[in-house]
Amino acid sequence: TILSKDDRSIEVDSFVPSTLVKSMPLFLKFLSLRTIAHWLLAFALTHPAIAQLNEETCAKLKDLGRFYDNPDGKGLQNAKLFLSYQHQVGHINGEDGQGQAFKDDFEEFRRFWMGLSGSFGSYWKFKAVSQLSNDRNNHPDRKGGSYRQWGHETFRAANLTFDADQFWDFASIDAMEMGYGRRTGRMADEWQRSSTMINCLERSSFSNKLWLYDQENGNPLAAWVKWKAGRNTFDTAIFSGTYDDYIGGWTDSKVYYASWLGDYSESSSYELHEYWLSYYKQEGSLTDERLAGGNDWAFSFVNRIGDGPWALHTTLAFGNNGDQTAANREGDFGGIVLMPMYWLMEKKLKLVGRYLYQQSAQSEGLKLNSRYIPLADSRDSSIDLNSGRGDEHHAFYLGLNYYFCGENLKLVNGLQYDDLRSAGANQYQGWTIGSSFRIWF
């Protein structure tokens, strides 16, 4: 039990087996020739004759963006171009709250980002990453139009950092960074790494709910200090809710953020053993531009353990939706995400699982990812998925990733089952399958 609702606890364990049993006919219906063909294509691309790339080729890919390196220089000391391209296809097959079956297909330029990073003056680093794509070809005309737009949309990162420890040589700490600009507010485990490094096709909707996203689903402006002492790393920051396509200002809400990372790997029997605590509190009114959809506060506990070919990442978090335009979207929420992973072929083929359970105190206190359930709802007026909103959500994910050149060139494939309810009534249940080609340097 995670939260109480109307003085009644919602039991998770009894729900899971019955949900899976009831979903089997829908799953069998889902396995059409078309979806099987998607999987066959994905596996064909991973055949050794096609997929094998030698270490020299992969090393060239990883270093492709490096174009300047002069560590002894007094001005610019190094610089690197960044590019990330991801193309994604998906298929959904499910039932709405009235039991009406539907299915839909999607194809998109998932991400196309370019950027520049480097260091100068011995103590300074800079980073800027521009989102250059806005692919809405899957959206209906009545929801803002169906189009593919190219050019600068927003910055995913744009910041300047100062190596304070190297400059002042603090005796009691190992490192200290001071920074200003646009950056990520890390909460759930899935947001501890870049989109180029995530293990699933999409981050879970619960991790996205905790994320400090701005009104254009980007990373906000912040000022921060981060330092490391022994096994402990601390991060304190103030984030601004004010949005701008470029840098922005400080005229709207403010979010106060703090986190602690404890790395116990050296003293543990596991190769990987980490704990992460993070918290934020937002101050702002309903009329302000706000982060994280207006969340008032959130607290997250992350544990990561791993040994040899396996790893288990866990996120447990709670929060409050803050003031919303509709009362049934306010109130407390909480959830848990378990992500086991196993290397079937070392550094080549990884099996990824994920279980998600989340619930909220109000009937529409949760919302699923736009890919692809709410999107399917907007495309088909004959079904009603309540725009992907509800108060209780289960999701089971199973993925298989093939790494041509480590994280720099890979194929990510995943199958997910979702069950969404609101006030005890079913809103959606069904399966989503997808595949994504991802390359970056």
Features from the language model and the residues they span:
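Hydrophobic alpha-helical membrane context
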Residues: 17, 46, 50, 134, ...
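Intrinsic disorder/low-complexity segments
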Residues: 2, 36-38, 43-50, 223, ...
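Small side chains
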Residues: 42-44, 179, 335, 414
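Outer-membrane beta-barrel pore domains
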Residues: 53-58, 88-104, 127, 143-151, ...
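Short N-terminal segments immediately surrounding and downstream of signal-peptide cleavage
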Residues: 54-69
